[in-house]
Amino acid sequence: MKVLLALLLTGFSTCSLAQQSLPNSLTGEKGDPARGRSIVVNRQVGLCLLCHSGAFPEEPSQGDLAPDLRGAGARWTEAQLRLRIVDPMHLNPATIMPAYGKSEGLWRVAPAFRGQALLTPQQIEDVVAFLATLRD
């Protein structure tokens, strides 16, 4: 918990509304795109496909509330993707997308999940690495 908070504070120290990104990896290393893909399609972990859709033929039921993930790597840099995952409300205060990298300052969190981020810093980096590969 303290490590995640420290990483987030370090990342946010280099983030501004003008640049709209988190340029530094939360782990200091690149993520693994294969692990990131498995997080995105896993409804028990990433929850991404509840709202998003994409080229995931193994998942017939996909969301339509949020942008299609196809071409995410062409639309946003890794730094922009990272911020969108860690704290999407930083970019859009009205978003319904959860802050996958925050554990404080949230509301309507089930008691069992209070004080926990939805994804670890490594999982976030893996998802960023995967989304960055989606160029078409």
Language model features with spans:
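Positively charged n-region of N-terminal signal peptides that target proteins for export
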Residues: M1-L4
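Electrostatic cytochrome c docking/interface patches
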Residues: Q19-R43
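Sequence context surrounding c-type heme c attachment/ligation sites in exported
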Residues: A34-L49, P60-G63, Q116-Q122
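The canonical Cys-X-X-Cys-His
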Residues: G36, Q44-A55, L81, V127, ...
